[in-house]
Regions:
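Acidic catalytic loop of the alpha/beta-hydrolase fold
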Residues: 176-180
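Serine-hydrolase catalytic-loop signature spanning alpha/beta hydrolases and amidase-signature enzymes
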Residues: 4-14, 27
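Short beta-strand/loop motif that positions the catalytic acidic residue
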Residues: 165, 171-173
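Short alpha-helix in the alpha/beta-hydrolase fold that links the catalytic acid
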Residues: 167, 181-190
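Catalytic histidine neighborhood in serine/cysteine hydrolases
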Residues: 190-206
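Active-site loop/oxyanion-hole signature of alpha/beta-hydrolase fold enzymes
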Residues: 23-70
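Catalytic histidine-centered segment of alpha/beta-hydrolase-like enzymes
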Residues: 204-217
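Flexible "cap/lid" loop of the alpha/beta hydrolase fold
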Residues: 80-88, 92-125
Length: 229
């Protein structure tokens, strides 16, 4: 499980355990480098930070946990990273699941980030972030805001990655996601080279696995079915 730009294992809450029960699969959720309880990052995010997660972290997880095949699931930017994992290891990726993933830089995305920047300027809101990231909180927040608002990032898209992903995919998105319109899941489904299903969740914003958890778990149960043994 690949978390979002401000996320960590703790912020998935009970979802990983519930996902394991719903699908009968082992679930691995981890803090990306610089987030949660991982070691603090020593530098800004690299320009290729999405591809780097598939290139560097995925093999480390495979070595550490002793697995090869996997289903890649990610939330928000973690969804883009999950797609990168599917692209990087097509021989090992059984399926792809994206939740509220961005496929390009949209005005709504930037507006949502600017609004969040204002909100986190308040000490009480920043303290909520620090509760989960500790001394890493400032780096976590700046990495998200500075990357997405950087004009050099404005032309980023997931298109090239999607075109190489052939495994089955489930693309979940909240109808009222403040960080991305329904154009994102539509573009993901259209761009994937393999079979894909889009599910737009009514009444949901950016965190469907919290806002519409029963529907999300049911969809994942139906999509993943019994694990291969």
């Amino acid at each position: 499980m690949l978390h979002d730009s401000l996320g960590c294992v703790a912020l998935w809450r009970e979802f990983p355990a519930e996902l394991a029960r719903a699908t009968g699969r082992d679930v691995i959720a981890y803090d990306r480098a610089g987030f949660g309880r991982s070691a603090p990052a020593q530098a800004p995010l690299p320009a290729d930070f999405i591809a780097a997660e598939a290139r560097d972290s995925l093999p480390a997880l495979q070595r550490g946990f002793g697995f090869a095949g996997f289903v890649a699931l990610g939330h928000s930017v973690g969804g883009a990273m999950a797609a990168a994992c599917a692209d990087a290891q097509p021989e090992h990726c059984e399926a792809l699941v994206t939740i509220s993933a961005q496929a390009f830089v949209e005005a709504r995305t930037l507006e949502g980030i600017r609004a969040a920047r204002e909100a986190f300027a308040r000490p009480d809101q920043f303290e909520r972030l620090a509760r989960h990231h500790g001394e890493r909180a400032r780096w976590v927040l700046d990495a998200w805001i500075d990357t997405w608002l950087d004009p050099a990032f404005a032309g980023w898209t997931l298109d090239a990655t999607l075109a190489r992903v052939r495994c089955p995919a489930l693309v979940l998105h909240g109808e009222h996601d403040q960080y991305g319109s329904p154009r994102h899941p539509a573009r993901i489904v259209e761009g994937l080279a393999g079979p894909a299903r889009m599910m737009l969740l009514p009444g949901c914003a950016h965190v469907p696995h919290r806002e519409a958890k029963p529907a999300v778990l049911q969809a994942l149960h139906g999509f993943l079915g019994a694990p291969a043994r």
